[in-house]
Amino acid sequence: MSINQQYVSGKSTEVRDVTIIGGGPTGIFAAVQCGMHHINCRIIDSMPSLGGQLTALYPEKHIYDVAGFPEVSAAGLIEQLWSQAARYKPEVVLGDKVVDVKKLDDGSFEVFTEKGHSYFSRAVLIAAGLGAFSPRKLPQLKDFEHLEETSIFYTVSSIDHFKDEKVVVVGGGDSALDWTIALLNVAEHVTLVHRMKEFQAHGKTVADAYEAQETGKLDIYLESEVASVLADSDRLTHAILKTPDEEITIEATRLLPLIGFRSNLGPIKNWGIEISGNGILVDNHMQTTVEGIYAAGDIAVYEGKLKLIQTGLSDAAMAVRHSLRYIKPGEKVKQQFSSQKASEKKA
């Protein structure tokens, strides 16, 4: 994804209407909403590129549950979202982490970054996903860390790493099942290992996995775990599985544990907003306990929350719309429609 350099800033003294903390799908769509409501914004993200987890961890993963896209890659979705946002020319600050947010006497906010920069805005929207995150690793493989990124992978940056390999996938959630299905067309053989009796993934994907098992394309071991591995020099050769009945050794040249992430809100906990678990408590307008600070996407906590890309986009729309009441008090907030914008341009 290319971002026109005119939008990228290292430091800017201009006061924006909204500072968006986080450049994942929720943050990018928040910029779209800002543009539609005729307010300007700045996106700040600690990563070197936009996209959050989608581009940092799973750029080639295919997504099937976003409305309007029967199938789209993670990187492709971010590309499309950015094409929407770019028309409004949001300022983008990459490679710098927000470490503090202070509310000023006039109700505006000063945002401080790790590199010593300060940014000012009239409202703040936190769309930081899981906060700081790292993949959960298998503790029994601590003596094989030298094989990580060559034979043992905890994320998939390129599916080519698994081409014509004997792959063992560990996990039972959506990521594990999605990648298992995707690898069937790439790897020499795929084995799926899950420590529980049932999978915790979408029913359709689970059905696809069992169908692949019936045709011999996939081996499935439930109530099982990878006890250890065997390696020849710097290459994985076998995985040792502990099953309900016995311990077995199978050929494996790639190991892909996909067992979730460890998340940490980090400095966000010290910003004076109410925290709930590993998220930020918000009301039905996506506003936090500090007036003028909003949260959207996976980091936002409210009753009935679903952690999906499309709900994150909805969160962003609600947050931006309500922020207008704070940014422009007394002005009537009008509902904006994309079709209305198109007709305005034609006129």
Curated annotation (Swiss-Prot):
Pfam families: Pyr_redox_2 (PF07992). The keyword rRNA-binding does not apply. Its EC number is 1.18.1.2. Keywords: FAD, Flavoprotein, NADP, Oxidoreductase. It comes from the Bacteria. It catalyses: 2 reduced [2Fe-2S]-[ferredoxin] + NADP(+) + H(+) = 2 oxidized [2Fe-2S]-[ferredoxin] + NADPH. Binds 1 FAD per subunit. SUPFAM superfamilies: FAD/NAD(P)-binding domain. InterPro entries: FAD/NAD-bd_sf (IPR036188), FAD/NAD-binding_dom (IPR023753), Fd--NADP_Rdtase_type_2 (IPR022890), Ferredoxin-NADP_redctase_2 (IPR050097). FAD binds at T26, D45, Q53, Y58, V98, F133, D298, S339. GO terms for molecular function: ferredoxin-NADP+ reductase activity; flavin adenine dinucleotide binding; NADP binding. The keyword Ribonucleoprotein does not apply. Its cofactor is FAD. Belongs to the ferredoxin--NADP reductase type 2 family. Homodimer. HAMAP family: FENR2. This is Ferredoxin--NADP reductase 1. It comes from Chloroherpeton thalassium (strain ATCC 35110 / GB-78).
